[in-house]
């Protein structure tokens, strides 16, 4: 979707340096103490689900399973979540590549306001500095969720990523995001999401330009068919001078207490994931992707080992391209420090990348 969004912008001089797509902006800095930042993909937290059914997720506790059973007895179906979150549970198990040295300092100025300083030094990519701000509003929906949420991130070159998320009503959530590259305005989008008791519908409008006649419109819909099965689709319409097109995808998600299987099939290809919670400490995932445009397929296996008593989190992965990766996070109590180590090895290209990170606060 991010490639389509970039393609919808009219050409204007040389392209700016590569930047993340607007739909997938870099993750915001951690939320202030005592609050949980809502998913930027539009998913609603448990605090805003009161009276509208609860989302079915694998690995739920016994009380959650009992609640789901009660919903079935009274004829109610659970909310299926959002279309963008279909593959998220599996993809979160895979390690994220980090190269060089990264230092992050989180400073909570109050219960609602936090700033973040990040310095990254790399041997391959450019070294940079990021300043992030997170503000959580006073509209309290639950002990861990409040609105509006304002998130901003600016680097040393002046490039800005900013998002505003607000809960307009118990079922309606909106988001606005902008992205600049130095002094140039790159992307902006507006999202609206409505979550009912057994369905979720969302619309995204990106980079609309009435004068040039360009823009992109994305519509998502996901419906619970049974307590375990949800079906839905995505429709993407993009237009710019001399070009327009529509891309459609269908999705299916099957959820049980400790595993989740999801498949997305469309004109661009196929994407399938399987997530399994083996225990409270071990989670595994398998991902398969096939692209009709690139004429390429890939398969990946990832796992996450979490030992809370040891303050230890490990993620590992291997894929069909013979790329092996791993990350390790170790908290160092009583100090507010988190140590991160990362290593990736590409056997085919004989390349090795490693990274070291330290988070304070």
Curated annotation (Swiss-Prot):
Protein name: Mitochondrial import receptor subunit TOM40 homolog
Residue segments, region Disordered: 1-72
Subcellular location per the Swiss-Prot or TrEMBL entry: Mitochondrion outer membrane
Pro residues compositional bias, start-end: 11-36
One CC-aspect GO term: pore complex
Residue spans of biased composition, Low complexity class: 1-10, 59-69
PANTHER family referenced in this protein's UniProt entry, alphabetically: MITOCHONDRIAL IMPORT RECEPTOR SUBUNIT TOM40
Function according to Swiss-Prot or TrEMBL: Channel-forming protein essential for import of protein precursors into mitochondria. Plays a role in the assembly of the mitochondrial membrane respiratory chain NADH dehydrogenase (Complex I) by forming a complex with BCAP31 and mediating the translocation of Complex I components from the cytosol to the mitochondria.
Organism per entry: Rattus norvegicus (Rat)
Binding partners and assembly: Forms part of the preprotein translocase complex of the outer mitochondrial membrane (TOM complex) which consists of at least 7 different proteins (TOMM5, TOMM6, TOMM7, TOMM20, TOMM22, TOMM40 and TOMM70). Interacts with mitochondrial targeting sequences. Interacts with TIMM29; linking the TIM22 complex to the TOM complex. Forms a complex with BCAP31 (via C-terminus) which mediates the translocation of components of the mitochondrial membrane respiratory chain NADH dehydrogenase (Complex I) from the cytosol to the mitochondria.
Topology relative to the membrane: Multi-pass membrane protein
Pfam families: Porin_3 (PF01459)
GO biological process, one term: protein insertion into mitochondrial membrane
GO MF annotation terms: monoatomic cation channel activity; porin activity; preprotein binding; protein transmembrane transporter activity
Keywords: Ion transport, Membrane, Mitochondrion, Mitochondrion outer membrane, Porin, Protein transport, Transmembrane, Transmembrane beta strand, Transport
Protein family per UniProt: Belongs to the Tom40 family.
UniProt biased composition (Gly residues): 40-50
């Amino acid at each position: 979707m991010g490639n389509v969004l970039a393609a919808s912008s009219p050409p204007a001089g040389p392209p700016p340096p590569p930047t993340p797509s607007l739909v997938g902006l870099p993750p915001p800095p951690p939320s202030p103490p005592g609050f949980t930042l809502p998913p930027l993909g539009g998913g609603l937290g448990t605090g805003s689900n009161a009276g509208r059914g609860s989302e079915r997720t694998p690995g739920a506790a016994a009380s959650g399973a009992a609640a789901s059973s009660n919903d079935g007895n009274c004829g109610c179906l659970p909310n299926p979540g959002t279309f963008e979150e279909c593959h998220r549970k599996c993809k979160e198990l895979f390690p994220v590549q980090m190269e060089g040295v990264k230092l992050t300092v989180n400073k909570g100025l109050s219960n609602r306001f936090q700033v973040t300083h990040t310095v990254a030094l790399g041997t391959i990519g450019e070294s940079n500095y990021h300043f992030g701000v997170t503000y959580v509003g006073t509209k309290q929906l639950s002990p861990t969720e409040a609105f509006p949420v304002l998130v901003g991130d600016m680097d040393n070159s002046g490039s800005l990523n900013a998002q505003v998320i607000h809960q307009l009503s118990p079922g309606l959530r909106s988001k606005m995001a902008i992205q600049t590259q130095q002094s140039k305005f790159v992307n902006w989008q507006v999202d609206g999401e409505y979550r009912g008791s057994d369905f979720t519908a969302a619309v995204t409008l990106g980079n609309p330009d009435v004068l040039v006649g360009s823009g992109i419109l994305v519509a998502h819909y996901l419906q619970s068919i049974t307590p375990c099965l949800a079906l839905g689709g995505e429709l993407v319409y993009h237009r710019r001078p001399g070009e327009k097109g529509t891309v459609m995808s269908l999705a299916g998600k099957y959820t049980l207490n400790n595993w989740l299987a999801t498949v997305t099939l469309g004109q661009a290809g196929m994407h399938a994931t399987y997530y399994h919670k083996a225990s409270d400490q071990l989670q595994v995932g398998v991902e398969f992707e096939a692209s009709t445009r690139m004429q390429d397929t890939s398969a990946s296996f990832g796992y996450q080992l979490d030992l809370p008593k040891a303050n230890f989190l490990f993620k590992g992965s291997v894929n069909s391209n013979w790329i092996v990766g791993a990350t390790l996070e170790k908290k160092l109590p009583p100090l507010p420090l988190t140590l991160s180590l990362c290593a990736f090895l590409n056997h085919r290209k004989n390349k090795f990348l490693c990274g070291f990170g330290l988070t304070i606060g």
